[in-house]
Swiss-Prot record:
Protein name in UniProt: Sodium/bile acid cotransporter 7
Transmembrane segments: 11-31, 38-58, 72-92, 117-137, 139-159, 164-184, 202-222, 235-255, 271-291, 299-319
One GO CC term on file: Golgi membrane
Lineage: Eukaryota, Metazoa, Chordata, Craniata, Vertebrata
Subcellular location: Cell membrane; Endoplasmic reticulum membrane; Golgi apparatus membrane
GO biological process terms held by the UniProt record: bone development; heparin proteoglycan biosynthetic process; intracellular calcium ion homeostasis; sodium ion transport
Membrane topology qualifier: Multi-pass membrane protein
Stretches of the chain found on the membrane's Extracellular side: 32-37, 93-116, 160-163, 223-234, 292-298
Tissue specificity comment: Strongly expressed in liver, adrenal gland, small intestine and colon. Moderately expressed in heart, lung, kidney and spleen. Weakly expressed in brain.
Source superkingdom: Eukaryota
Topological region Cytoplasmic: 1-10, 59-71, 138, 185-201, 256-270, 320-340
Length: 340
């Protein structure tokens, strides 16, 4: 019974495993030109559905509630979309001389280029008791920013423009991401009261569509006889991903707790999660667009598929520790305040 409850709670993680397993059993169903017609249903309909859903669920006022804390927002966005991908690129120059599969290494670079997720960083910040408003703003703002910045970073670091025209990427992104998002926000204005009363399962809808995208991505993988992935590379990539997450969490903690940083303990909590988490919901559709038709798309996507559950699991494990630190630091601040 406890196992069933756990499966129900972690249904998306289980769904990823099932989707990959189903793709392995019968990859012909989800390949381009197959019965599911992913070149239409995934590339356009599924991606547009995810972002229309995001437009419906995202409260516009959340983007302005924490707008005044410019220093915090600048720190998070620069770390996420500049420092993170650049550091990963430098690190990969060292790893390029190893025997690790080159497409997995390219996948690690794509992880660095991704924007923050809309949900997980906010959920963990709230669980700790950190600055939730800042987490909401930066997750939402970072997602919007990522629509433009992430494709540019992918083209810059991976040079995929040789196979996919730059204008083609942005036209498809505009039609499948920006337009549905804006339409979702417009529709939300007219049914706002109903949405707040009924609270539709937006997260479940987006995650379900995302599982379809993951399934068709791996159908392409398993139907390609040229792909060869050794277990050593896979295990090593998992170790590298966890090491990257821990290292960057420690870095953001050190930077944001300096005496002259100007950040509160609650701000630091939001910074730790928002600066180091990467979006799977935005990432996979973007990779599908930027690397459309690429024979190694699934290998490029694999590090992000590993990074996403790893960041949630690692963050969940660290919640009690970070919460204990924040509470003790806040008590210390109160005790050191001069009495009037």
């Amino acid at each position: 019974m406890r196992l069933l409850e756990r499966v129900r709670k972690e249904w998306f993680m289980v769904g990823i495993v099932v989707a990959i397993g189903a793709a392995k059993l019968e990859p012909s169903v989800g390949v381009n030109g197959g019965p599911l017609k992913p070149e239409i249903t995934v590339s356009y309909i599924a991606v547009a559905t995810i972002f229309f859903n995001s437009g419906l669920s995202l409260k516009t006022e959340e983007l302005t509630s924490a707008l005044v804390h410019l220093k915090l927002h600048l720190f998070i966005q620069v770390f996420t979309l500049a420092f993170f991908p650049t550091t990963i690129w430098l690190f990969l120059q060292l790893l390029s001389v190893t025997s690790i599969n080159e497409w997995l290494l390219k996948g690690l670079q794509t992880v660095g280029c991704m924007p923050p997720p809309v949900s997980s960083a906010v959920i963990l910040t709230k669980a700790v008791g950190g600055n939730e408003a800042a987490a909401i703003f930066n997750s939402a703002f970072g997602s919007f920013l990522g629509i433009v910045v992430t494709p540019v970073l992918l083209l810059l670091f991976l040079g995929s423009s040789s196979s996919v025209p730059f204008t083609s990427i942005f036209s498809q992104l505009f039609m499948t991401v920006v337009v549905p998002l804006v339409i979702g926000q417009i529709v939300r204005r007219y049914i706002k009261d109903w949405l707040e009363r009924k609270k539709p399962p937006f997260g479940v809808v987006s995650s379900s569509v995302l599982l379809m995208i993951i399934y068709t991505t791996f159908c392409d993988t398993f139907s390609n006889p040229n792909i060869d992935l050794d277990k050593f590379s896979l295990i090593l990539i998992l170790f590298i991903i966890v090491s990257i997450q821990l290292s960057f969490m420690l870095l953001t903690f050190v930077f944001s707790t300096r005496n002259n940083s100007g950040f509160t303990p609650a701000d630091t909590v939001a910074i730790i999660f928002c600066s180091t988490h990467k979006s799977l919901t935005l990432g996979i559709p973007m990779l599908k667009i930027v690397f459309a038709g690429h024979e190694h798309l699934s290998l490029i996507s694999l590090p992000l598929l590993i990074y996403h559950p790893a960041q949630i699991l690692l963050g969940s494990v660290l919640v009690p520790t970070i919460k204990s630190w924040m509470v003790s630091r806040q008590k210390g601040v109160k005790l050191t305040r001069p009495t009037v």
